[in-house]
Amino acid sequence: MRRRRRRDGFYPAPDFRDREAEDMAGVFDIDLDQPEDAGSEDELEEGGQLNESMDHGGVGPYELGMEHCEKFEISETSVNRGPEKIRPECFELLRVLGKGGYGKVFQVRKVTGANTGKIFAMKVLKKAMIVRNAKDTAHTKAERNILEEVKHPFIVDLIYAFQTGGKLYLILEYLSGGELFMQLEREGIFMEDTACFYLAEISMALGHLHQKGIIYRDLKPENIMLNHQGHVKLTDFGLCKESIHDGTVTHTFCGTIEYMAPEILMRSGHNRAVDWWSLGALMYDMLTGAPPFTGENRKKTIDKILKCKLNLPPYLTQEARDLLKKLLKRNAASRLGAGPGDAGEVQAHPFFRHINWEELLARKVEPPFKPLLQSEEDVSQFDSKFTRQTPVDSPDDSTLSESANQVFLGFTYVAPSVLESVKEKFSFEPKIRSPRRFIGSPRTPVSPVKFSPGDFWGRGASASTANPQTPVEYPMETSGIEQMDVTMSGEASAPLPIRQPNSGPYKKQAFPMISKRPEHLRMNL
């Protein structure tokens, strides 16, 4: 049976675009509060007098107010007594999760300092490879800016970022559930309630990005990861665009063709509505086994996206059919989600009528698939061609010039959650002595090509405000049952039963007919 080809995904590829598979990454850059100077001699003397009063029947320790305690700032520097130096040696390599032209992604265990013993994914990128291509530098910059700004239950977290002379290291949360793509590969297609769950969580992540003025532009199964419970985590922010608010458009041609909105292909100017088209294309992929418009090559695929009818299988419910038609409208202005309500418009559709949005955001809704994991280190949801390799981080034998390294200024990061976990270990009850302050493929996504070399890592509004051209409108027609081609398999596609949580191992490929997915979209096994 022919099967899907793995497309650009999360852990399986550290390089940014033209590669076998692609992983998530994000780079933070925050300025940690600097520790205050050491206490003065007067303060130390005062502390000495306090101890002396205790020794001679003075006030008891629990009679002191907080005014007798010295306050100090919790920061990476202060809690680690002059800071914990995050470096490659802080992590033990466990498995290879992915490999690409720019480096590797490892499963690692932290062996020193805060988070000792915890499992992470470590993405290693070669600086020399990144700086050779302005587009790849732009991808890194976009991910850094966005993941610095957004924190959401359905968006991936980055814990640490650091660098050596020739490499960048990104320490990410380990998402042991693997890619949503792998679930589609196993099941062939999803039942509507399964698709509804994933689409609902994804819509909340997209809505959060849009509130921040960010459009995603590369929604596809490979960029959606699952955590150990089976909840969605949106990854890979290299093609995002910032500062896109109401009335603002951008003209960059980028994305993955099969999921790209018509206005991107026509270069007529686009806004956040492109993400709702992509959600519709993803929904169609989940329910039918392939994106809505595919061709033998990119040109034919683009022609179909711009001109062809939307064929809807007869087994889809009326709610699913209606949502697909409203999301896959070629006229962006009339597309569901394009209005001021954004994600709220999509979430109010009857297809999501059974979703409790508050419980979903709190991750209290049980996912349809819960990964069967044996331990925290389980890598069964990742490609064995990587995980069976011996993990080796090659020597850092290359360095950049001082001017080239300027691109990576502000790279180092420690997540606030790490500082909070350390802060909890400190008691703020009054002490006898006040605490002292410490001293010191055809599926290759199309990348954006706009990049200002002098911009580097700084933030700022860069959105184009040019008036969009008026796009040529082709009517979107939908087919009836008579247009369904069922001759190849002798039967029409239909939803399949799926494994319920905790009811047994995952099924293997279950699609009952020859896959409708084009050869270049299938996994090579």
UniProtKB/Swiss-Prot annotation:
Signal peptide: none annotated. The modification Phosphothreonine is found at residues 252, 412, 444. Belongs to the protein kinase superfamily. AGC Ser/Thr protein kinase family. S6 kinase subfamily. GO terms for molecular function: ATP binding; protein kinase activity; protein serine kinase activity; protein serine/threonine kinase activity; protein serine/threonine/tyrosine kinase activity. This is Ribosomal protein S6 kinase beta-1. Widely expressed. Residues 1-54, 380-399 are annotated as: Disordered. Changing residue 289 to E: In a colorectal cancer sample; somatic mutation. GO terms for cellular component: cytoplasm; cytosol; glutamatergic synapse; mitochondrial outer membrane; mitochondrion; neuron projection; nucleoplasm; nucleus. The lineage of its organism: Eukaryota, Metazoa, Chordata, Craniata, Vertebrata. The modification Phosphoserine is found at residues 394, 434, 441, 447, 452. A motif (TOS motif) lies at residues 28-32. Residues 381-399 have a biased composition (Polar residues). Phosphorylation at Thr-412 is regulated by mTORC1. The phosphorylation at this site is maintained by an agonist-dependent autophosphorylation mechanism. Activated by phosphorylation at Thr-252 by PDPK1. Dephosphorylation by PPP1CC at Thr-412 in mitochondrion. One of its GO terms (biological process) is germ cell development.
